Amino acid sequence: MRALILLSLGLLRVAVPSPPQVVVYTYKPVVHGEKNTLLCHAKEFNPPNVELQLFEDGNVFSQANQTDLSFESNWKFKLTKFIELIPREDVEYSCHVMYMGKTSIYKLESF
């Protein structure tokens, strides 16, 4: 009986929606004119229906790569979108995160 109660509590925790925690960053410190990787990492979300898109001055990077969706030991998910680029000054880099019908925009702040 105790195992059934613990299982029920665990499933209840999984059933509660949890929005993603998102960070946008570069693999290395930004040096203009040098190749780098722009990443958008979303974690701690459930259910796993999230979409990430990387943008440069409002234009989507259609060739961006994405990791496979995976989950942590707490049954919350994580996903990363990334693209190799040469960062340019005066350009805004951002990640649009679509989750449960809502879009949130996160900007790269390291410039």
From Swiss-Prot:
One of its GO terms (cellular component) is MHC class I protein complex. It comes from the Eukaryota. It is found in: Secreted. PANTHER family: BETA-2-MICROGLOBULIN, MHC CLASS II-RELATED. Heterodimer of an alpha chain and a beta chain. Beta-2-microglobulin is the beta-chain of major histocompatibility complex class I molecules. Pfam families: C1-set (PF07654). Keywords: Immunity, Immunoglobulin domain, MHC I, Secreted, Signal. The keyword Ribonucleoprotein does not apply. Its main location: secreted. Residues 1-17 form the signal peptide. Component of the class I major histocompatibility complex (MHC). Involved in the presentation of peptide antigens to the immune system. This is Beta-2-microglobulin. GO terms for biological process: antigen processing and presentation of peptide antigen via MHC class I. Gene3D superfamilies: Immunoglobulins (2.60.40.10). Belongs to the beta-2-microglobulin family. Residues 20-111 form the Ig-like C1-type domain.
